[in-house]
């Protein structure tokens, strides 16, 4: 069981820390209990204190991040102040928002094996953990790869696999879907379903809510460093969409998004293309048009084209995993040349 008793925390006033509030305190008088085997969603607008609360639950506060900490956090009845980070890591597996911040190796297989190795598992057991995690998360194609060659989404997948390889009783995840596309999120949801079925305790901080629908048993809504709402899954889902929007939350159902056509079927992660796409603000003529430009990247060929108009603002578009979105940004910044077009 996880228990927070009148917890308040403020970072040193030396600058912003991942958007969390510093001047008035990142957390204020947090009191809550999370039962074993429960699935809890932390939600709220950016800067509300979600990330700071996850750092309290996985021991990074007070053992790594400095600040003013009052109250107590208990894991299995033990105060986190009295536990070392190593002891906490045996109980809690963490996945951070930025996967690069938690890598210890330069290749993917070693990264997956890092946790079990440091917990003293025999070599055979370590290999079996890596095999099992790769199978569950569909990471087989990422094994024996350089960390530096991975896309953002691939790095997050390896980070999730590294946490799962430790096989902890508690999982604390801070926006794990932030670098994943819709298909990868669907795969990740399946992993969460398996962990939930195993009776694991899961605490997940997220802006994307739709993939956690019918998974989370409980929702804690945070604002200004406080827990402003404590809902059962049914209570949260029954809130009117307008109310959730007022709370600064994203839709629970992607079909609620206006003007977006969702893809039907799965034809492969690498088959997304952008063609004949135009963008314009209401007060300006067309500022962006995409036809087709081809350039190689990471051993593959990305086919994306772009034509800029005069005095454009900053339009944006999104596409699927390994669609070439990152390559497009690198191309427009001048880091990689076009192959044609």
Protein language model regions, located:
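Conserved ABC ATPase "signature" region
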Residues: 124-142
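ABC ATPase C-loop
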Residues: 163-164
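H-loop/switch region of ABC-family ATPase nucleotide-binding domains
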Residues: 206-207
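Conserved ABC ATPase signature
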Residues: 146-150, 154
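Conserved ABC transporter NBD signature motif
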Residues: 66-78, 327-341
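Catalytic Walker B motif of ABC-type/P-loop ATPase nucleotide-binding domains
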Residues: 171-174
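Helix N-cap at the start of a conserved alpha-helix in ABC-type nucleotide-binding domains
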Residues: 182-184
């Amino acid at each position: 069981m996880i228990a927070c008793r009148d917890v308040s925390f403020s970072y040193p006033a030396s600058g912003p820390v991942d958007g969390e509030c510093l001047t008035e305190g990142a957390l204020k008088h947090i009191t809550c209990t999370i039962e074993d085997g429960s699935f809890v969603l932390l939600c709220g607008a950016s800067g509300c204190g979600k990330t700071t609360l996850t750092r309290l639950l996985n021991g990074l506060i007070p053992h790594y991040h400095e600040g003013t900490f009052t109250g107590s956090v208990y894991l299995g009845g033990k105060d986190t102040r009295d536990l070392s980070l190593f002891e906490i890591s045996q109980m809690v597996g963490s996945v951070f928002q930025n996967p690069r911040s938690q890598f210890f190796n330069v290749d993917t297989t070693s990264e997956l094996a890092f946790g079990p190795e440091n917990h003293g598992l025999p070599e055979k057991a370590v290999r079996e953990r890596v095999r099992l995690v790769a199978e569950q998360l569909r990471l087989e194609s990422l094994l024996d790869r350089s960390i530096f060659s991975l896309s953002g989404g691939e790095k997050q997948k390896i980070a999730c696999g590294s946490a799962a390889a430790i096989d902890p009783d508690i999982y604390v995840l801070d926006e794990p879907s932030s670098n994943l596309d819709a298909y990868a999120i669907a795969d990740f949801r399946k992993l969460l379903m398996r962990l939930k079925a195993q009776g694991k305790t899961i605490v997940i901080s997220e802006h994307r809510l739709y993939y956690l629908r019918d998974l989370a048993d409980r929702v804690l809504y945070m604002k200004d460093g406080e827990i402003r709402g404590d809902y059962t899954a049914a209570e949260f889902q029954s809130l009117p969409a307008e109310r959730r929007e007022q709370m600064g939350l994203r839709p629970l159902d992607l079909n609620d998004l206006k003007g977006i056509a969702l893809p039907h079927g799965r034809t492969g992660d690498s088959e997304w293309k952008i063609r004949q796409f135009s963008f314009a603000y209401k007060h300006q003529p067309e500022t962006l048009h995409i036809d087709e430009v081809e350039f190689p990247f990471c051993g593959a060929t990305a086919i994306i084209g772009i034509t800029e108009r005069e005095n454009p603002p900053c339009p944006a578009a999104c596409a699927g995993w390994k669609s070439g979105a990152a390559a497009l940004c690198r191309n427009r910044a001048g880091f990689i040349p076009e192959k044609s077009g």
